[in-house]
Amino acid sequence: MSKCVVVFSGGQDSTTCLYWAKQNYSSVSAITFQYGQKHQAEINAAKKISELAGVVEHWVVDVTAMLKAKSALTDPEQNPGVFSQASEGRPNTWVPLRNAVFLNVAANYAVSWGSSCVVTGVSQEDGANYPDTTNAFIVAQQNAIALALGDVFEIKTPLIHKTKKQTVLFAKEITGCMEALKFSHTCYNGMTPPCGRCHSCVLRAQGFASAGIIDPIKMEG
């Protein structure tokens, strides 16, 4: 039986990866991280979509104590700002080493569940501003985990070379994915409906617009 664990935030990309995993693995579990983020919206979205997807296990793991370095996602005194501010240089929403922590903890849970595969929704398109979303980082992380285990281990990244437009078109071809995206949460400001101004909201809107598809969140609202 092929098994995998999906690193699942409840956002657009990880929801797409969760439903991709359901098509490609016979048994899928999800792991969601509480890392000190200022709002609960993404955790709630992850719980809702995991239930909708019918995953075998959905673990919610608190790693707040492992991520002391702050960002606008975790520090009450910082504001995520708007897209025009975030598009220049590294955005203040970057949490140093967050993906490294997520992948290592997810790998530990995967091994405990009898799996040698983790799926994550990182994209090389974000690599200029987020160094832990590059293919080079993923390859290095996969090799490090395999060495630490003394065994084969895979990190699958279905979206690594896709643009936001391509990600939307990819999701459209996956059974159940667009319906699930109705419940996903992307907004850095934790707003429902989404603020439409933060970096994450604008990139999501651009992706759906360029794909010529109405965002299911808008249809729901």
Where are these regions (language model features)?
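Short amphipathic alpha-helical interaction/hinge segments
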Residues: 149, 209-212
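Glycine-rich nucleotide phosphate-binding loop and flanking beta-alpha elements
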Residues: 126, 208-209
